Amino acid sequence: RLQEFYNAYTNMIFTRKWLRIYLYSGLKGLDINRWYVGVVQDEILTRVIGECRHEAGLPSHNKPTAAELEMAWVFHSGIFYYGVRKYIYESPVLEDKEQMISDALDAFLAGYEKVFGSAVNLPRAPVKAVG
């Protein structure tokens, strides 16, 4: 399901126009950028984390930790930056976007299980969000 979602999601946002508007709105400090970041975190990344927890047999009803959210942002941002490199910087990228997404998903899911697999409920040093 994540592969299908990210294929469809990137089909919508991977245009030079969309990426330029998004990036410029962030540089200008416009509310639309902050709103969209909130939507991505609340509607996409939180659900991705819930699915990861479910797959790992962990409780999925708890709010994501700061560390989980950061790892999900790193994953999501890597896919996003592929579009920036291709459509804004016009840099060479792997032409098979679906393969890039599949590889990113494999790395993220394996990494999630390695980092959080059985440690979500164990006490950890608090992670403080900055900004």
Residue ranges and their predicted role:
Residues 4-17, 21-23, 31-58, 70-73:
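Amphipathic alpha-helical packing segments from all-alpha helical-bundle domains
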Residues 129-131:
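Acidic, Ser/Thr-rich low-complexity intrinsically disordered segments
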Residues 6-7, 105, 109, 113:
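A conserved short alpha-helical segment within the catalytic HATPase_c
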Residues 12-13, 78, 111:
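Conserved catalytic core of Hanks-type protein kinase domains
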Residues 24, 34, 55-106, 115-127:
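Hydrophobic/aromatic-rich alpha-helical bundle segments in the mid-to-C-terminal region
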Residues 27:
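Short histidine/acidic/glycine/proline-rich micro-motifs that form metal-
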